């Protein structure tokens, strides 16, 4: 089915879709695809790309706070609430289009207490992170909001992370059992549909 859909698109349609894809996707009339809006981040819809105001959204607790609750049910409810806000439509002063996608949740591991984005990630525990991510994604999905779990993978350091990609080294066992486990759980249990990659270069030995 996916191949059939792609085969219906022209080269120019594919090129325009890829080249105009940050925080939105363009409409493609030939296949009836509507334009979409997507927003960052893990504490709800935000707009750090411009000075435009956002209306009708909530600033939710940071994921590290949600992780401290150990409560998947309340995290799922938060996902449902964000999904409801996405449906509302009049979020941006520039647009009536509701948000279709959400760049969240952040499900990397607290490898160090000095991690620059630990507040965006649930825990140092891979199982807890996976359970809560799956719950949040499931809640958002139930309202028609697709999510981009992030940052895949081993994105536990902000310093130098996007200057040609920091080199991250780990054993295969650590990668599988600790760092990839939350992403696996989010897909298998939460039915995640999207992913945001990290900039780092990953090596093992």
Which sequence ranges carry the predicted segments?
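Glycoside hydrolase catalytic-domain context in secreted enzymes
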Residues: 1-205
């Amino acid at each position: 089915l996916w191949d059939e859909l792609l085969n219906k698109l022209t080269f120019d349609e594919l090129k325009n879709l890829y080249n105009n894809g940050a925080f939105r996707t363009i409409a493609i009339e030939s296949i009836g695809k509507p334009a979409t809006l997507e927003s960052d981040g893990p504490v709800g819809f935000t707009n750090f790309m411009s000075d435009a105001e956002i209306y009708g959204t909530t600033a939710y607790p940071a994921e590290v706070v949600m992780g401290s609750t150990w409560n998947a049910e309340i995290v799922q409810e938060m996902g449902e609430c964000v999904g409801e806000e996405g449906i509302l439509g009049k979020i941006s002063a520039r647009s009536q289009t509701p948000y279709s996608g959400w760049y969240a949740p952040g499900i990397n591991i607290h490898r160090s207490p000095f991690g620059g984005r630990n507040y965006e990630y649930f825990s140092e525990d891979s199982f807890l992170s996976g359970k809560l991510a799956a719950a949040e994604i499931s809640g958002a999905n139930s309202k028609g909001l697709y999510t981009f779990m992030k940052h895949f993978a081993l994105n536990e350091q902000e310093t130098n992370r996007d200057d040609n990609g920091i080199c991250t080294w780990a054993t295969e066992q650590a990668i599988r059992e600790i760092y990839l486990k939350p992403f696996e759980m989010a897909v298998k249990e939460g039915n995640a549909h999207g992913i945001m990659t990290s900039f780092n270069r990953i090596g093992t030995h």
